[in-house]
Amino acid sequence: MPILIVLMFLLGIDLSKKAFANIARNPKAVLLGLIGQIVVLPVIAFGVAWLLELSPVYFMGLMLVSCCPGGSSSNVFSMLAKGDVALSVTLTALSSVITLFTLPIIMEFVSVSVSDMSGVEINLPIGKLLVQNLVLIFVPMLIGGLFKHYFSNAAEKVKKVLSKVAFPALMTLALVFFYQYKSEIIDNFAVLGLSAAALILVAMLCSSGISRIGKFNGSVRRTIVIEVGMQNADQAIAIASSPFIFNSGEMALPAIIYALLMNVILLTYVYCIRLKLK
């Protein structure tokens, strides 16, 4: 959870008037990007989980990943892929706010559906989920934005320091979970890896199609592909393992596998893009 707070604080520092001005500058790109993240991605995840007949706990875990906002590291990947970084920041910020409300709604529908399909009763404490998301997502973003507004020079220095430790810390968290649940991961790696990879790749393909419908330029298309392909796995881990919500380390496993594969797939994508643009 502390890592998630740091990431959201950094996102708040990144926010600026230019980021929100991007909504007026390119509203179609913002709208289609958000549709890809908030609507299309959960549909893909549900389809993947259903087709692969995931167990209820893994079904919920994969859906949880798909309902989370874009990952903050997507801004860095957009820059590396020579995308529209301002659009990336805008989509990440807006999706982080919107999913405060869409995540509980979608997960409530999913929990009922999974219960009906499996016969296993799943209770989702929506109120606690909403409160935790406000505390872990919205409040740190707000504090980061206010810190940047009133102490801009100090904010830039803090950003440089935290940016260097945030991503390694996230990977360390994933590895710690990996070690704690290594037997479960080894036993289920084939299906978990396949489901996570399928979610990422199908999401990237669909977002590429969406961006082509919008007739965007290459930088905008690449940004939308990355934004839809990179979700905030840390938030999914925090929700799944929270003692106030699901209190299930096993439910966090799809997010852990997703985080590892997401970086491999997106780094490969960025490498191919940079080769193409040479």
Which functions belong to the PLM regions below?
Residues 1-278:
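Alpha-helical transmembrane segments of multi-pass small-molecule/ion transporters
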